[in-house]
């Protein structure tokens, strides 16, 4: 399965910048829904952070997904790859 990778940066209330990728099926292009996926992920964290906007969440590229990402997408409609300051 090919997935679209949305590169995302979010300002945390403690001053740190979260960096994570939102992965969705490559044919999925509903930007508002992708932002909703990211906001759902951010709201699951124990710290406060800003809401996602199109300025901080941008399409980056398409890649082939590993099995774990395919499983996440099958269950949730999306997958998150944590990069920096996500915990």
Residue ranges and their predicted role:
Residues 37-87:
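Acidic, low-complexity intrinsically disordered segments
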Residues 7-9, 29, 65-67:
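Short, well-ordered helical secondary-structure segments
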Residues 1-18:
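Short, charged/polar N-terminal "headpieces" of proteins
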Residues 17-44:
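Short, flexible N-terminal segments of the mature chain
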Residues 6-8, 22, 38, 80:
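Generic structural hydrophobic/aromatic packing signal, biased to beta-strands
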């Amino acid at each position: 399965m090919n997935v679209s990778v949305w590169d995302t940066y979010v300002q945390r209330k403690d001053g740190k910048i979260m960096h994570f990728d939102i992965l969705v099926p490559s044919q999925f292009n509903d930007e508002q829904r992708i932002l909703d996926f990211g906001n759902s992920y951010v709201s699951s964290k124990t710290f406060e952070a800003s809401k996602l906007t199109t300025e901080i969440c941008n399409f980056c590229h398409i890649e082939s997904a590993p099995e774990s990402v395919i499983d996440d997408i099958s269950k949730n409609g999306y997958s998150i790859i944590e990069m920096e300051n996500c915990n």
